[in-house]
Amino acid sequence: MRTRTAPRTRQFLTLTAAVAALTLPAAVPAVADTAVADTPVLTTGATGGTPVAVGDVLTASLASGTAATFHSSATGSSGVSCTSSQFTVTVTDNPTAPGTATETLTAHTFDSGSCTSNVTGVLGVNGITVHNLPYTTTVSSDGAVVVTPPSGSTVRTTVALRTLLGSINCVYEAPRLTGTASNDGNSIAFTDQRFTKVSGSGLCFANGYFTATYAPVTDGTEAVYVN
C-alpha cells in the first residue's frame, strides 16, 4: 500500500506546482492593469507619470520662436502680433484617465513691449487685456481643450492701439475658446479662434482671429502630460 501511495503523492504535488506556475503570472498583469487604471488625466514627467495634484499651479509661455496673433481674418496677416504671452491655471479636478481634468484660468497676459501691428494707421500696441477672469478650462484625454467664461459673461479682450489720431481701444468677445493639447512639446494650441468686435473705432477690425501655441505647460519645473 505504501509503495503505491508515494507515486500518487508525487503526482499530486507535481500537479499542484503546475497549477501554481500557471496561476502566479496571471496575477502580475492584474497589478499592472490596476496601476494603469489609476493614472489621472494630467501627470508630470511622462505619460503615466506623477499625478498632478489638485491645487497645483500650471503655467506656460509661447512656444519658442512663435507669436500670438490676432488677425482680421482667418486667412489674412493683418492685425496684431505678440512674441511674449503667458497663462496661469490652477488645477481643480484631475480624475482617472480617460476623463476630463478641470482648471481655473487665473491669468492670461501679453507683454505689450513684444507686440506690433501692421494695420494701416496704427503706430503701435499699448497693451492687450483679458477680462472676466477667472475662466474655467477643461482638458480631456483626447487632447480637447475648452476655455469657458463665467456664466452670463464672455471671453473678453481689449486691444489698446496707438494711432495717428491718438489711442483707441478695440474690445472683442467670444463665447468660448477651443484648443488642442499635445504631448509633443507639452503644448496647448489655439487656432483661428473667432472674436467679434463689440466696441471701438473704425480702425478696429470687425472680427479678430486668435492663434497661439503655448509650450511647454509646466507644473513647477516638470512638464505636464495628458493621459
Give, region by region, the residue ranges found by the protein language model:
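Extracytosolic low-complexity repeat regions of secreted or lipid-anchored proteins
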Residues: 161-167, 173-203
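Generic recognition of long tandem-repeat/solenoid scaffolds
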Residues: 53-54, 59-63, 144-158, 186-192
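Predominantly extracellular/secreted and cell-surface proteins with exposed
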Residues: 79-178
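N-terminal segment immediately downstream of the Sec signal-peptide cleavage site
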Residues: 32-98, 195-227
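Secretory targeting and sorting signals
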Residues: 1-32
